[in-house]
């Protein structure tokens, strides 16, 4: 990787960390440099704990075998909770969307995480996400309702359309979050009140 002139005066371990941090979403070279020098000044325990947490993240976290949310076990905490309504499944694009919906406190069903959306221009088709796994699940489990909670943008709406068409013959009620979420936004950034209202006001597709 070509290094800016101002980085060439720095020790190699410092340059390497700046470059690696710069690869994270939302972290530019300036922020990466500030974080690196903060860690350089920090007590040894902090960078060591951070390194261990990063290693643990990749070694100990996996996808739930049922809904594809993140977990340390075969089933995630939501799927393993008998108090959740097993007959309702909310379909979201990413794990952070589950966190956003849970924050509302109004939803007590299960989830299905697609890990993406249908976006042909980005090379993302139904085979690249957990689309068909949802269909298999609806066939195998006594699910009465599928709530489609993909993002209110072009790709999210396209994904919702394809999901509705595929789910229609399977017998479950298919609903979509009510209008009111900011168009073009991501579910994870919606405030809990607005998202909760969209869930409670969901409409038939």
UniProtKB/Swiss-Prot annotation:
Keywords: DNA damage, DNA recombination, DNA repair, Metal-binding, Zinc, Zinc-finger. Transmembrane segments: none annotated. The keyword Cell division does not apply. It comes from the Bacteria. Gene3D superfamilies: 3.40.1360.10, 6.10.250.240, RecR Domain 1. SMART domains: TOPRIM. Residues 87-182 form the Toprim domain. The keyword DNA repair applies. InterPro entries: DNA_Rcmb_RecR (IPR000093), Rcmb_RecR (IPR023627), Rcmb_RecR_Znf (IPR015967), TOPRIM_dom (IPR006171), TOPRIM_RecR (IPR034137). One of its GO terms (biological process) is DNA repair. Pfam families: RecR_C, RecR_HhH, RecR_ZnF, Toprim_4. A zinc finger (C4-type) spans 64-79. GO terms for molecular function: DNA binding; zinc ion binding. Belongs to the RecR family. May play a role in DNA repair. It seems to be involved in an RecBC-independent recombinational process of DNA repair. It may act with RecF and RecO. This is Recombination protein RecR. The gene is recR.
